[in-house]
């Protein structure tokens, strides 16, 4: 896009409301934003998308009293990462966990965000096969 500067990592500096420069109808979300050193994580993208959608809806609704320039306020829900089978790490607030419990938490959180019963069923089947064998459906 003309007139938009990106940093060395390709991220675009955005205004506090996720708009770009003086373009109040262009929003950038996710790992493409450079705002307050936010990490390139899915939860930043999801919250940013919801925020941008709310502001766009406010602009299109003539009766809306919402602030069309409301700043994006990111809430860190925590971070999880799988290390290997039955082993993961999680940091939620100031609490740090490792081992089986965060591994099960990771499965639950990621399963909950899958859309559709078919996708969830396939993911659970894949995880169960991986738990009980070295065979993976991805390789079949």
Q: Which role does the model predict for each range below?
A:
Residues 1-50, 54-58:
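FAD-site-proximal beta/loop scaffold in flavoenzymes
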Residues 54-138:
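C-terminal, flexible cofactor-proximal segment of oxidoreductases
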């Amino acid at each position: 896009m003309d007139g938009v500067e990106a940093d060395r990592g390709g991220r675009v500096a955005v205004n506090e409301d996720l708009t770009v420069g003086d373009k109040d109808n262009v929003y950038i979300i996710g790992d493409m934003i450079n705002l307050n050193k936010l990490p390139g994580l899915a939860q930043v993208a999801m919250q940013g998308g919801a925020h941008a959608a709310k502001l766009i809806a406010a602009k299109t609704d003539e009766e809306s009293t919402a602030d069309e320039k409301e700043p994006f306020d990111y809430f860190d829900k925590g971070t999880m990462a799988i290390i290997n089978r039955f082993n993961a790490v999680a940091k939620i607030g100031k609490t740090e966990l490792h081992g089986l419990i965060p591994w099960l938490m990771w499965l639950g959180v990621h399963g909950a965000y899958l859309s559709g019963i078919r996708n969830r069923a396939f993911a659970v089947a894949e995880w169960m096969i991986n738990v009980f064998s070295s065979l993976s459906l991805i390789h079949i």
